[in-house]
Every structure is written in structure tokens, then in C-alpha cells.
From Swiss-Prot:
Keywords: Initiation factor, Protein biosynthesis, RNA-binding
InterPro entries: NA-bd_OB-fold, S1_domain, S1_IF2_alpha, TIF2_asu_arc, TIF2_asu_C, TIF2_asu_middle_sf, TIF_2_asu
Function: eIF-2 functions in the early steps of protein synthesis by forming a ternary complex with GTP and initiator tRNA.
Name recorded for this polypeptide: Translation initiation factor 2 subunit alpha
Pfam families for the chain: EIF_2_alpha (PF07541), S1 (PF00575)
Stretches the record annotates as Disordered: 233-266
GO molecular-function term, one example from the UniProt record: ribosome binding
The protein's assembly and partners: Heterotrimer composed of an alpha, a beta and a gamma chain.
UniProt signal peptide: none
Residues annotated as domain S1 motif: 10-81
The UniProt record lists the keyword Protein biosynthesis: yes
The keyword Secreted belongs to this UniProt entry's keyword annotation: no
Basic and acidic residues: bias regions: 240-249, 257-266
Amino acid sequence: MKYSGWPEPGELVVGKIDEIEDFGVFVDLDEYEGKRGLCHISEVASGWIKNVRDHVNEGQTVVAKVLDVDESAQQIDLSIKDVNDHQRKEKIQEWKNEQKADNWMELAFGEDLDDETYAAIANELLAEFGSMYDGFESAAIHGKDALEDVDLSEEEIDAIVQTARNNVSVPYVQVTGYVDLSCPESDGVDIIKEALQAAEGNGEVPDEIELEVTYVGSPEYRIQVQAPDYKTAEDALEESADRAAKVVEQHGGSGQFHRERSEDDE
């Protein structure tokens, strides 16, 4: 997405060097429509510079810091040397992510999507998530729930969610725990089965969570959870064990959650 306005002083921008002069370099700003900045030779690199071309090349993609903006003069002053390696890598990754989001918008709404509609949808995602990429990632994880506060139509939300789930690689974490279940009742086997169904959530586990319960060795069962972050995963793990324990305890049995396998099983 290219912005139609102007960058702010202090902002980091991505651009391509399209002209090199003795006094500095001109940079086409990739994120701003029709905007070009000037990086004076003193802002290209630290120290004395004999030849600008020893430091940059035409066509090179750079990250620069905006020093000053004069809209009346159509001038943007930039500094390449004021951007450290960490900032550069972070900004380039952010820029690449937004390029991906641009492609996802095209997949979701078609190549013929007009600029006005594109901007309206993009601005809703930006306002809610800070970037289009984060909006698509959240939709991939949480589905429609992620977009409930976004002012978009049902059709637009469905298109975003479907595209996100087909194209966004979501980072997941995995946690494992164990629960010991026992029940002295004559129908104890059936009660344990009921407890395991409860542990698995009875079909009510949120879409962003994958939960599996497997048998280790009586009375121990393994619970494995995959989720977008550790807090969500840990909460789901403990809730799963609690559900199972509650079922057997209601029938005079016992349930105990622990993080490591019992020594007798190893």
C-alpha cells in the first residue's frame, strides 16, 4: 500500500536510490505515492566521504530516517547513516510484510478492486491492528472474531478470513502437560472416557487452539496444546486438565495435573 500523504520527521522509510550526485543521492520512497527524498552526502555514511558511489548504488533499496519535510517546496530530507542495523532489519521486515498484505488484498478482493475501496478496507485494518499484515495474521488465528470491531461488511470480512487462513503462516507454540485420572466406581471406564471428552473440549475449543489428549499409561494421559502464544497455550492446557479432573471428582475419583511424566512411566 502506498500512502498519499507525507512522511513525518523521525519516521523510517524504505526507498530505492534512483539518482546519485556529488552532493548526495535521491531516493524514491516506496511507501509514499510520488514522493522522492534527498539524502545529502553528509547523511549517507559516517565519516568523510570521498565518493558517494563507494557507499551506495543506483537501484539499491535503503532504509532512511526522515529529517525534515517541506511540503511547500516538495522536499524531503533523509539520512541513511542515522539508521542502525537493528532498525534497518526491522523496517525491511515490516515493509516486506506489507507487500505480502498487498498481495493478500488482491487475492481477497480481486485485481479489479478500485483504489477507493482498497483504501477504505486498508484503513480499517490499519486503525484496528496498526498494519494490514497484522490484520490478516489476526484473522488467520482468530477468524471472524478478530474483525468484530472493524467496520467492514460480512462479505469483506469473509474474504479476509478465507484468504488469511489460506495464505498466512501463523507462528504457533506447543506446550505439554499430563493429568492422572482414576475412578473407583464400577462404571469407572465410562467416567474416564467422559473425562477425556471434557478434556478435549467437547467441540468448544477456540479455532486458534489445537488440543490433543493421548493415553500414556494408566492412570496418566498426555495433553498437548498448540496456540498462537504461550499464555493462551498454558491457559488452555490447565483448563483442559481441570475439566477432566472435575468429571472424575464428581464421581468419587481423583484427577491431578502435572507438567512432567510420572517417573514410573519413564
